[in-house]
Amino acid sequence: METRKIIHVDMDAFYASVEQRDFPEYKGKPLIVGGPPNSRSVVSAASYEARKFGVRSAMPCSKAAQLAPQAIFVFPRFEVYKEVSKQIREIFLEYTDLVEMLSLDEGYLDVTFNKKNIPFAVTIAKEIRTEIFKRTELTASAGVGNSKFISKLASEKNKPNGLTVVLPDDVISFIDPLPVSSFHGVGKVTARKMKELGIYTGKDLRTKSIDELVQHFGKMGIYYYKISRGEDERMVQSSRERKSLGAESTFDRDKLDYDDLLKQLKDVAVVVERRLEKKDFAGKTLTLKIKFYDFSLKTRSKTLSEPIFKADELYSTAIELFEEFFEIKYGKKSAIKAIRLLGISLSHPNSENEDPNLFLNL
């Protein structure tokens, strides 16, 4: 069987780099794409100059301003980013039709059998990065491997403007020293739980039996067992139509307080808005997901007359669904039982089956 050749291409600080390209006065300066510095908006992107101060995507703009008071704040220009993204996708399609765009600034390519009959994936990755820079004046990082999991990890290895190749025989030695927090599917809460079990690196994860991992992480334990061995059979899906998108947040401590939970819900709505904008997605059906301290799960949905995508619309709709889970206790509004997770998703009204990756950890 032919060994798969998968490339993951990820643009470097995409939104910020487009702004620095179009406005030369921003070059070499800490630049933050998002809302005003004194707002509750979140950072959509930060230039590498801003990242040196600790500024990261999804961080509140107010916090970013504290970390980098000299930073320049600009509003995102999504129409411009979408046009550049189309240019990038056109380059990908010159090599293969098996292109899966994850967002405006990154995607997978399966080049096992490619249009130019180039035998080496690394050659294609080099050509793509060169062509992207030639046509857009932007840099991209790329990873080459035999699976989606490996190629994505590889693309993150030498950012910005880097290329990392992981040969099939080197997969285990590549995975072993990496922190599990860098693995797709391992969020902050899971990483913390893994550390409690003595799992810090890929090698630590690989020493655990499948039974141990299932005991502690449920069905995801099987996934963790496989990826620690470099096993990932997911195909590059060129025709995938996104039907839903959302985000969820797991709390360090279970929460009862109404006002505190509303703040958490607002934060989730802001992150969902950012992801919707990045994916150019809107939907009519909002689903609220609540997990209680005893791991019981409740979901409630509402279908609207028009598609929505803004945080305030998501938040106000979610609150309507949220109310039934509260009661007045001792003159104070509290959850009917302690809540450990909140999630919001948006989908098309004809989406019959939820995407298992719908709720991405914050």
UniProtKB/Swiss-Prot annotation:
SUPFAM superfamilies, alphabetized: DNA/RNA polymerases (SSF56672), Lesion bypass DNA polymerase (Y-family), little finger domain (SSF100879)
Cofactor requirement: Mg(2+)
Protein name: DNA polymerase IV
Gene3D superfamilies: 3.30.70.270, 3.40.1170.60, 5' to 3' exonuclease, C-terminal subdomain (1.10.150.20), DNA polymerase, Y-family, little finger domain (3.30.1490.100)
Cofactor note (record): Binds 2 magnesium ions per subunit.
CDD domains per the UniProt record, alphabetical: PolY_Pol_IV_kappa
Reactions mediated catalytically: DNA(n) + a 2'-deoxyribonucleoside 5'-triphosphate = DNA(n+1) + diphosphate
Oligomeric form and interacting partners: Monomer.
Residue span(s) of domain UmuC: 6-187
Record function comment: Poorly processive, error-prone DNA polymerase involved in untargeted mutagenesis. Copies undamaged DNA at stalled replication forks, which arise in vivo from mismatched or misaligned primer ends. These misaligned primers can be extended by PolIV. Exhibits no 3'-5' exonuclease (proofreading) activity. May be involved in translesional synthesis, in conjunction with the beta clamp from PolIII.
Pfam (any one): IMS_C
Keywords on record: Cytoplasm, DNA damage, DNA repair, DNA replication, DNA-binding, DNA-directed DNA polymerase, Magnesium, Metal-binding, Mutator protein, Nucleotidyltransferase, Transferase
Residue positions binding Mg(2+): 10, 105
Family membership: Belongs to the DNA polymerase type-Y family.
GO cellular component terms given for this protein: cytosol
Annotated PROSITE patterns: UMUC
EC numbers: 2.7.7.7
Cellular localization per UniProt: Cytoplasm
Top-rank taxon, per record: Bacteria
Active site: 106
Site (Substrate discrimination): 15
One of the record's GO molecular function terms: damaged DNA binding
Leading EC class: transferase
